[in-house]
């Protein structure tokens, strides 16, 4: 059975396959990131989001896979066979778990739409012949920023800028910090 773990999130395995394998951080770095950013939400008995649920399941599966790999490593007599198993797990399973964790962490951090836009942008960039594409690949953290191009001609009338709230004091941010839920 061929199951695409990204389907319900609007992405596909193919869409993530445009990103090279060395793009994804190590399992250790991803676990550290998840722990630093989402530990409370992942441990919470509340349902936070489908991304939290997917991360919980993927972390549990990785733990079970590491238990199995340890058992195989301890019980397989032939060193060549043991190395084959370890290399297979690290190369194939490790890449899949790194992709999965990166996707869900990125969706929680930047938003699903931004991540999908990034995947499409990167896919277009990587498939464009080098002579016709910009030298640098798109960067996920800069995607939400938009460039405003002014028309030529009359300059817009000048106004005194209105006082603005600092971002960190916005009501939305305050509300989310004061909520009792960890999500």
Swiss-Prot record:
Region (3 X 8 AA repeats of S-P-R-R-R-[PR]-S-Q): 155-177
InterPro entries associated with the record: Hepatitis_core (IPR002006), Viral_capsid_core_dom_sf_HBV (IPR036459)
Keyword terms of this UniProt record: Capsid protein, Cytoplasmic inwards viral transport, DNA-binding, Host cytoplasm, Host-virus interaction, Microtubular inwards viral transport, Phosphoprotein, Repeat, RNA-binding, T=4 icosahedral capsid protein, Viral penetration into host nucleus, Virion, Virus entry into host cell
Domain of life, per lineage: Viruses
Record's subcellular location: Virion; Host cytoplasm
Region Disordered, annotated ranges: 136-183
Sequence repeats by residue range: 155-161, 162-169, 170-177
A molecular-function term among this protein's GO annotations: RNA binding
Phosphoserine: residues carrying this PTM: 155, 162, 170
GO BP annotations listed: microtubule-dependent intracellular transport of viral material towards nucleus; symbiont entry into host cell; viral penetration into host nucleus
Modification(s) after translation: Phosphorylated by host SRPK1, SRPK2, and maybe protein kinase C or GAPDH. Phosphorylation is critical for pregenomic RNA packaging. Protein kinase C phosphorylation is stimulated by HBx protein and may play a role in transport of the viral genome to the nucleus at the late step during the viral replication cycle.
Major localization class: virion
Chain ranges for the short sequence motif Bipartite nuclear localization signal as given in the UniProt record: 158-175
SUPFAM superfamilies for the chain: Hepatitis B viral capsid (hbcag) (SSF47852)
GO CC entries: host cell; host cell cytoplasm; T=4 icosahedral viral capsid
Family: Belongs to the orthohepadnavirus core antigen family.
Function of the molecule: Self assembles to form an icosahedral capsid. Most capsids appear to be large particles with an icosahedral symmetry of T=4 and consist of 240 copies of capsid protein, though a fraction forms smaller T=3 particles consisting of 180 capsid proteins. Entering capsids are transported along microtubules to the nucleus. Phosphorylation of the capsid is thought to induce exposure of nuclear localization signal in the C-terminal portion of the capsid protein that allows binding to the nuclear pore complex via the importin (karyopherin-) alpha and beta.
Assembly mode: Homodimerizes, then multimerizes. Interacts with cytosol exposed regions of viral L glycoprotein present in the reticulum-to-Golgi compartment. Interacts with human FLNB. Phosphorylated form interacts with host importin alpha; this interaction depends on the exposure of the NLS, which itself depends upon genome maturation and/or phosphorylation of the capsid protein. Interacts with host NUP153.
Protein name: Capsid protein
Source organism (scientific name): Hepatitis B virus genotype B1 subtype adw (isolate Japan/pJDW233/1988) (HBV-B)
Biological classification of the source: Viruses, Riboviria, Pararnavirae, Artverviricota, Revtraviricetes
């Amino acid at each position: 059975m061929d199951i695409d773990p990204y389907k319900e999130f609007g992405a596909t395995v193919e869409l993530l396959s445009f990103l090279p394998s060395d793009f994804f951080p190590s399992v250790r770095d991803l676990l550290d990131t998840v722990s630093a950013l989402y530990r409370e939400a992942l441990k919470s008995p509340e349902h936070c989001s489908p991304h939290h649920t997917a991360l919980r399941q993927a972390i549990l599966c990785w733990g079970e896979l590491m238990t199995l790999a340890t058992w195989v490593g301890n019980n397989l007599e032939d060193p060549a066979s043991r190395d084959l198993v370890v290399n297979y797990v690290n190369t194939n399973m490790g890449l899949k778990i790194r992709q999965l964790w990166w996707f869900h962490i990125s969706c929680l951090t930047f938003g699903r739409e931004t991540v999908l836009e990034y995947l499409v942008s990167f896919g277009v960039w990587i498939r464009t012949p080098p002579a016709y594409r910009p030298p640098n690949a798109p960067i996920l953290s800069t995607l939400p920023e938009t460039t405003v191009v002014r028309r030529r001609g009359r300059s817009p009338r000048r106004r005194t800028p209105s006082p603005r709230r600092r971002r960190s004091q916005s009501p939305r941010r305050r509300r989310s910090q004061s909520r009792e839920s960890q999500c």
